[in-house]
A protein has these predicted regions:
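Amphipathic, Lys/Arg-enriched alpha-helical "gate/interface" segment within cytosolic domains
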Residues: 1-126
Length: 126
């Protein structure tokens, strides 16, 4: 399951995966953020807040996740990954080579710093 919250007017999306991801998680996510992106052009930021990566429920969920990344990574200014997981903490180094977005890792204790960093990103103009 992927909990999500779109902070308005900042245009910051917060994602909190807490169970294996389903294809429906991404369908719900897209239906909420695509209208915002259509109106504003981009999201100012995306925060992934996770204790650990829960994986995918099945191959369909994996495909939906990859399609979401492919179709949205150029529409996000900054990505913060908030976690104490060693494995997830390494993802920004990998992601920097694959996506066109500023990526930064923050520990759990730096949650507010991560949010502040996202808010400092290029403001989205209507």
């Amino acid at each position: 399951m992927l909990k999500h919250q779109l902070l308005l007017p900042e245009g910051i999306l917060i994602l909190e995966p807490d169970a294996p991801l389903e294809a429906a998680d991404f369908e719900g996510l897209v239906s909420e953020i695509d209208p915002y992106i259509a109106e504003h052009g981009k999201l100012s930021g995306l925060m992934v807040h996770a204790k650990a990566f829960p994986g995918w429920a099945n191959l369909e969920a994996f495909r939906a996740h990859m399609q979401f990344i492919k179709s949205h990574h150029q529409k996000i200014v900054r990505l913060s990954l908030v976690t104490d997981s060693t494995l997830l903490g390494e993802l920004p180094k990998i992601a920097a080579h694959l996506v066109h977005v500023q990526v930064k890792h923050f520990s759990e204790s730096q949650h507010e710093d991560a949010l502040r960093w996202l808010k400092e990103g290029t403001p989205v103009s209507p």
